[in-house]
Amino acid sequence: MLKAQVFMFVTVLVFVCVFINSNDAKRYIEYPPWQKHPCNPRFPTPDCYKRTPANPYRRGCTCISRCRRDCGGLSTWKKLLDTILKIPV
């Protein structure tokens, strides 16, 4: 009778340990998501990369050169301060 109880205890203990380990393994081990990213890193194809235009648009004039547009430079700040600090004479 004692041997049967020990055998049942050990069997249940092994079963519980295997069950706990299998749940932890499913929770923490993640295999590569083949559906999310179909490209194989070992054999990349041109479809795997993001396409960029050959000649991206760039405006020829920058704020620092102050040509053809107002970038909110010194003149804009000066106008704002003049309107705020307008002192009646």
Swiss-Prot record:
Its GO biological process annotations read: calcium-mediated signaling; cell-cell signaling; regulation of growth
Q: Does the keyword Signal apply?
A: yes
**Could you name the Gene Ontology cellular component terms for this entry?**
apoplast
Task: Using the UniProt record, give the first listed, main subcellular location.
Answer: secreted
Gene Ontology molecular function: hormone activity
One Pfam family in the UniProt entry: RALF
Signal sequence coordinates: 1-25
| Disulfide partners | C39-C48, C61-C67
Keywords attached to this entry: Disulfide bond, Hormone, Secreted, Signal
Q: Where in the cell is it found?
A: Secreted
Task: Give the matching InterPro entries.
Answer: RALF
Tell me, using the record's free text, what induces this protein. Answer: Accumulates during senescence.
Protein role: Cell signaling peptide that may regulate plant stress, growth, and development. Mediates a rapid alkalinization of extracellular space by mediating a transient increase in the cytoplasmic Ca(2+) concentration leading to a calcium-dependent signaling events through a cell surface receptor and a concomitant activation of some intracellular mitogen-activated protein kinases.
Into which family does the record put it? Belongs to the plant rapid alkalinization factor (RALF) family.
Q: Which PANTHER family match?
A: PROTEIN RALF-LIKE 15-RELATED, PROTEIN RALF-LIKE 16-RELATED
Please identify the protein, giving its name as recorded.
Protein RALF-like 5
Name its species. Answer: Arabidopsis thaliana (Mouse-ear cress)
Q: What's the source species' lineage? A: Eukaryota, Viridiplantae, Streptophyta, Embryophyta, Tracheophyta
